[in-house]
Amino acid sequence: MTIGFDGKRLYDNKTGLGNYSRTLFNRLLQFYPEEEYKIFVHQKYFEDSQYKYPAFVDRTIVSDAFSADLWRFKGVEEDIAQHGINVFHGLSNEVPELPSGIKKVVTIHDVIFHKLPKTFPFIDRQMYSYKTKKACHIADAVIAVSEQTKQDLIELTKTPEEKIHVVYPTWNKEYEHECNYVLKEEYFARYGLPRDFVLYVGAVSKRKNFLRLLEAMNLPENQDKHLVAVSNGGDEYGAAEEYIYDKQLEGRVFFLKDLPWYELPIIYHMSQGLVYPSLYEGFGLPILEALRCGKPVITSNLSSMPEVGGDACIFIDPTNVEEISAAINFIYYNLELAAEIKTKAMHQIQKFNPQKMTQKMMDVYRSL
């Protein structure tokens, strides 16, 4: 069987959608090397990519069509047909119309535009709604990254339940490496980080609720604590900078921008734990990553986050600053928590075992 993939996010996206694409592709190569894989991408996204690994490049078809957007919408069909693809997988909420002999799979990561409409301009909401509904309609199989996303899709698109398969994302191989004292010391020095800190990973945006996390850090009981945010900015980054300046938090809040993806597991290991008070997630990969590192996680009691965290997380009302603050205090000073969390985390992450999740994905491909 020859399986094709949309390579835009794989080559061009540094965050969640890109990580999902790269991890899935690498795991398929690891567990199912007997199958053939092809990545289709426009040179606009390929040319300056930092992800030109031999395993990807050797299996990539690069288009030099005049318009990258038009090629992804229509021109890619011809390229896919020419390369003997049996199944084509759109990895991020879109899939092209293809000849009937080529089966189509699409991964839908979330429907944020539907659940939190005020965080999107009207035109964007209409476009995302159209693309999502169309992708679910023309695909032979729809991959939802969580049960929550599956239910959201049924509500929004009326897609038959039997057409939607829940296949959880998993962690990449970097999370399986040990992180010893010497390595941690190297990274404390490299980035000038405080010796103890809680970690945030994600955009500085309204949906991610970062400003409330800053408010929690500014409460009197947290004046001795530090926050490290691994983030490349977002729609509230300016407001966050202003708040940090006004409240004189510069010495306690640190941003790590453009952190190489392979260094992130080390930062998790260095932290006291993850604080992830998002208002909505289709999945919430940082929760899984932190649990894989055996770290305490504070996250929201909304959408998919309880599904991912199970009984291994501390759940809070993300709109309650005092609740966020109390949870930070708890993981900072409760030394007995570490061993308990590690035990629960190791149990919870088995739900997302890489081999099991990759097998579920391959089962979908082979069923078509």
Predicted regions and their residues:
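Carbohydrate transferase catalytic cores enriched for Leloir-type hexosyltransferases
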Residues: 1-368
